[in-house]
């Protein structure tokens, strides 16, 4: 018998078995257990937040997306030390670009401008810049991110930045295009064209970065845009293997292996890279 029958007319549920000893604890426990058992599906947007930035050129504020670094889980980097993280490609969010005046730079360099550099930016960038409406997006696309890095590169050239800064921007663009290629299926003419364009940009900017950092190591003192000498040498060694510059790669590897400042982990990686160089040289002979 339903002891609570008749309550329906008041809009209240009168069905179910009456048990005044049940205070709802059992129901809450079942709900909590179900919640714990259901995994939370995290996506890229869960690791981002909006942050206001003030442009040092035009003094206008704008919003950029930034990564919640405390929540990031590092994954194994690529052979050339391109950083990888779970759920989000942090490199996409490495540039601040003012939508009003066109000035852009990597975050670590954005506010560091001399009076003369501000003048050069205003004359060479802002005077010719045509603002465009910023798209509303929860996460940055690779094309959008690369666009901002390219703005950072022309700003770096306009302000006569160190070669290490320009080379690092080129390296990041190459890394972004390489990551993008992994997301594009080679199944339609449109996608094949996208892959072809990405490959061209990847190789072009990777070469600029390689040539740039080779010169940087002989013309600048470390750190090179925040990277120590060993890190840059190791990146260059991998890039040299990519371009089959085996003499350059071998010299860099030997220097790293014999250096007391090189970590054990990096020395192990250098030994693996040395084996790769030897194997490729043997393959070329055969």
Residue ranges of model-derived segments:
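Short cysteine-rich clusters marking metal-coordination/redox-active sites
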Residues: 54-59, 98-101
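Amphipathic alpha-helical repeat scaffolds of TPR domains
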Residues: 124-153, 158-194, 227-239
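"A position-specific structural signal for the A-helix of alpha-solenoid helical repeats
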Residues: 172, 231-238, 242, 268-280
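Short recognition patches in nucleic-acid-associated and regulatory proteins
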Residues: 60-88
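Short metal-coordination and nucleic-acid-contact micro-motifs, chiefly zinc-binding Cys/His arrays
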Residues: 49-51, 94
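Structural signature of alpha-solenoid helical repeat junctions
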Residues: 165, 201, 205, 221-229, ...
